[in-house]
Amino acid sequence: MACRLARLPEASVWEFVAYPSAVRNLRAVAWSTAPGAAEISADGSPRRLHYAPGRWLLPDPDRDMQDQLDAGVASGFGVRLDVEGKWAAILLSGPDARRVLASTIDIAAVLANRGCAAVSLFDCPTVAMRDVDRYRLWVAASYAESFEAAVDRLSR
């Protein structure tokens, strides 16, 4: 199979966890409150991924995003967590990337109407995002080697 896996360089990664009572207020400041929304920057990189109810993953946040997070915390909407080291960022590409992932879940169906999702791929907790002809994945770091081994096995 033609599938390439590349572990991306470590970068700053934050999560924002909204207090249940504050989710409605986030809508007023233009945060998507529907899980599955993926905000992408002009260069195509992920900016804010709403991967589960009340939870957002923010890979390598720029100054503007950091300011938005600080404002959310200051307004009492939730907490910002530095989760550097929690996730291993992986890029899965090639004509058979979807087929490899389909051996664990129907990734096309999961991401059909959403920009991102919290899923379990090969029993590894993952935040998945479709990116044109490839997948950007944030695999729980303690599972990354197991994930890479599963992809390697299926890519042969």
Predicted regions: what is each one?
Residues 1-156:
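Basic, glycine/lysine-rich polyanion-binding surfaces/domains
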